[in-house]
Amino acid sequence: MDPKAIKEELRLFQSTLLQDGLKELLNENKFVDCTLKIGDRCFPCHRLIMAACSPYFRELFFSEDGKEKDIGKEVVLDDVDPNIMDMILQYLYSAEIDLVDDNVQEIFAVANRFQIPSVFTVCVNYLQQKLSMANCLAVFRLGLVLSVPRLAIAARDFIADRFETVSSEEEFLQLAPHELLALIGGDMLNVEKEEVVFESVMKWVRNDKANRVKSLAEAFDCIRFRLLPEKYFREKVETDDIIKGDPELLKKLQLVKDAFKGKLPEKKPKEKKEGEVNGEEEGEEMLPGFLNDNRRLGMYGRDLIVMINDTAAVAYDVVENECFLAAMAEQVPKNHVSLCTKKNQLFIVGGLFVDEESKESPLQCYFYQLDSFSSDWRALPPMPSPRCLFNLGESENLLFAIAGKDLQTNESLDSVMCFDTERMKWSETKKLPLHIHGHSVVSHNNLVYCIGGKTDDNKALSKMFVYNHKQSEWRELASMKTPRAMFGAVVHKGKIIVTGGVNEDGLTALSETYDFDTNKWDTFTEFPQERSSVNLVSSGGNLFSIGGFAIVELEDKNIGPSEITDIWQYEEDKKTWSGMLREMRYASGSSCVGMRLNAARMPKL
């Protein structure tokens, strides 16, 4: 056996034996020489244990020369919750403590007050692991109050990642000036526009104008005015009544206006301090913070095509021809359906997965959301009606899984499952007028459109239905010119574009476009090859086609379906499809969506 392992095993055995023995002595009230009195409750303990675990109690019980102080057996502790101290004492003797969200901050404060580092560290670790939108500001403030840099920095970074959302919370308006400045000053703020920072500061000031106006000059140094559009600066910043009333702020604004014209204040050499020699601390003074034009972390966002398969989610930048790893995806089943919402949230649902350990419900329809901050998939409640060949739509905070094939009966469905992203619950909503599978779904202005598909008798449809969730109503609209199933569909520049697919005549390359205002379908530029299962994506104002299946000559010289992994772009001025990449290996077996992601946060492939 490895000597280090033997040593660790012996240490663990001895510490366990010692701890069990000490707990037994406490339970049997043996060698007890101290009582902590809190209100009307008393807690027996051992001075030696308290002194060993806490510098506070060591100083209380012993003098600097190591002699025991004669302070009596009873130690009175004021302003302490006896239940909290009881939990801490039990931890010191057993290494067990039941931390929950409701008690951790109070335990943390008591451990800090009485200098009990073991409990303190356990609480810090718990709070770091449990950081959430609900507690991040409280944890940040706690870390500052108790002077715990590790916790304050972890909470600050969490808030910086989600600044736009956190800054809209009521608790944000309660921050002290030094707390606000600690959040908004850094490069790591995840905001796409500096307007968000300016508006959050002014909202914070107005929440307590009488007391906070005096802090605005300091907050100004954290706002990067040169990153604001000049039009916004003129219309929103210069006209603000609070700013106009402060001569000091107006001087700073004049420097910003000069900077917009290309005139920056001269950088003066740093003054030498007494004792410095040439070469030490040389350089120029930095520009004031309000003239800082370094981009924040969130300003590196790009419109990307995200390809998700059962191996990874890869984001492709068409303009730069670069790929980034958005997340590994081993837990994502094949043949899932993906959707990127208006709020830029990526969800994937379904895929064929058989849980052999579950006898009651072996077929599972898993459900994940991409956490772009941690580059990981967050598991959500599985869809209760396992199905394949369905599709997804959205309306406000609701997702809709529409029709498809039942995984157990293999029959087409008309049911529509609805997931509330705020309540985190699935429910069933108004059924589709038809039983179909292999259809496409798009969303526009909080309405959900179900297009084409196949019935159980293998007949391709040209019908289109629109769903209004507020009215719980499906309504039939104009039909496509060509019946089709397993085709690409996307909303691009305010119109629906469909291309490819399969019908009774085989694969098709025909494309169509739908005008929402006139309720009419028109012919769109035909795709260069007959294909099914095409991924149509609208990204950065451009239309792309990724992959699909075509009938080609196979390696054995027979003719059959084969997956294609190329990328095409539609050139609007020429009204033609232009080939961009002959092969994109990450597109194999992938669903594809257009999504805005931060390239600075993802490893480049």
Curated annotation (Swiss-Prot):
Location of the BTB domain: 32-102
Keywords recorded for this protein, A-Z: Cytoplasm, Cytoskeleton, Endoplasmic reticulum, Kelch repeat, Membrane, Repeat, Sarcoplasmic reticulum
Keyword Glycosyltransferase carried by entry: no
Residues annotated as domain BACK: 136-238
Subcellular location: Cytoplasm; Cytoplasm, Cytoskeleton; Sarcoplasmic reticulum membrane; Endoplasmic reticulum membrane
A Pfam family per the record: Kelch_KLHDC2_KLHL20_DRC7
Residue runs in coiled coils: none
GO biological process: proteasome-mediated ubiquitin-dependent protein catabolic process; regulation of sarcomere organization; sarcomere organization; skeletal muscle fiber development; swimming behavior
Listed InterPro entries: BACK (IPR011705), BTB-kelch_protein (IPR017096), BTB/POZ_dom (IPR000210), Kelch-typ_b-propeller (IPR015915), Kelch_1 (IPR006652), KLHL41_KL41B_BTB_POZ_dom (IPR030571), SKP1/BTB/POZ_sf (IPR011333)
Protein name, as recorded: Kelch-like protein 41b
Lineage: Eukaryota, Metazoa, Chordata, Craniata, Vertebrata
Originating gene: klhl41b
